[in-house]
Amino acid sequence: LLGAFEHIRQLLSLTSSAKRDHLTPGYFSFNSGSGRCQRCSGNGFEKVEMQFLSDLYLTCPECNGTRFTKAAESYRYHQKSVVDFLRLTASEAMEFLEGIEGLTNKENLLLSKTRKALQPLVETGLGYLRLGQPLNTLSGGEAQRLKLCRLPNYRFPE
């Protein structure tokens, strides 16, 4: 949501285990990374075409809907895997990120950027949205508020 996941992927790639394995932030992308589930292409579900009926969507049996491989899930930033981050709500992510101390300058910068990206969601009452929530599951009102959050100078009425 609003670019926050980009910074989280960078934080995951800064861990000692990810550096040891020469992983980039792209590894933690469910859109194109090699860490995504190959069976469902990072969707978390498989589409079954039912000819005369509506298509059926089943949870991917390989990743169980997490979108990532077990190997990608094993990398952790302060005890949270990429899947754990995607399950957090915007409010939970803000709270988690504020509690981390003793970081490098680069980590502090990335955490600051992540909080800055999530802050409009919390301020507009969208703090309950999960970081990995598909956009097609949002209501019309949620989608509209999310769009307003992307405007750089927009201030919500109080």
Please identify what each model-predicted range represents:
Residues 1-158:
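Conserved phosphate-binding elements of NTP-dependent enzyme cores
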